[in-house]
Each structure stands twice: as structure tokens, then as C-alpha cells.
Amino acid sequence: PTGKEIHLTIRSQLILDVDEKVNVDISKQEGAGEKEIISAKISDINANQNVRINGTVVRVFPPAFYDCCPQCSRKAANDKCSDHGDVKSAPAIVFSFVLDDGTETVRCTAFRKIGEQIAGLSAKDAKEKSENPVLLQEEIDNNILGCVIEIEGSVKDNKQFDRMEINISSANTNLNPITIAKQLTSK
């Protein structure tokens, strides 16, 4: 076949801006797309895996913030989005913590809505409260420190700090202890 081949990710967007008719054949490559999510212990995780882990939040780091486009959630410096031009940017949160599952610990990072869910605060409220970082940290600690949560995310090898880390794609902060006990005793 003749033509051009373009490789896209799940977040890619292809916009055709041509006058002539274009025949587009979209096919998914074998093995491409979402990786299988595996339930794992922290001691067993490896880079490039998508994992589901239950654990206790044992350390919480102060959140970071950046401005994002309200339409696409990408970073918007000085109220300018690379895709949407001038926008009224909204604060977005980056929230990190350490999760312990009894086998090891791992640093986990959540962005935007998932970060808000885990921290128990909206990015807007957290950013406003960040003017008093001690009170903000205390509130977040009270919301999540010591809680058992389930996360799903992709494992990354942080070579700078020589450790595995997880970028969270979803989180469940309302686990049922009876269900967890049944899962643990059935293994």
C-alpha cells in the first residue's frame, strides 16, 4: 500500500485539513492500546506495568499546582492554551503520597481530578488554602493519612531517585473493610 503511516496514542487527535477526499484506514496494532491491569504487591512491581494495589497511605507530600485549560486540561501558562488560545485557566493539583501494602512502599502521584479525590479537596480550595501551607497539610493529612485505598496506575522507573513510582489513573478511597478481609482470606 502507498500513503503515509501515522502512529497515535490513546490521547492523540488527528485533524485533517485538506480539500481533497482522503481515505483513512484506522487499525489498531496487535498488542497496542491499553495494557492489562494486574493486581500486584508493591514488592513485585516492574516498570511499564499497569497495576492495581491496595495499601495504606503512610506519608503525604505538600501538593503542587499548575494552571490548566478548562477545555482540554493541558497546562495553560499565562492563560494561554496551545490548542485553545486565550482561556481563563483553572488550577490543577498534583498530589503525591507514599503507599505501603505490607511488602514495600511506593511513591504515588495523582493529577487533577484524581488528586482532588484522594486529597479530599478541590484544586481551587487547596490552592487558596496553600497560602497557609501548615493548615493545608494538616487538612490533607486528616483526610487521607492512614487510610487504606486502592489505586490503579502505571509503574514508572524514576532513574534519578532509583525507585519505582506509580502515576495513578484511578483511585478508590471508600473501600469496604469486609470485602478486603474476604479477598485477603481467599488467597
What kind of feature is each model-predicted range?
Residues 1-187:
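Single-stranded nucleic acid-binding proteins centered on OB/S1-type folds
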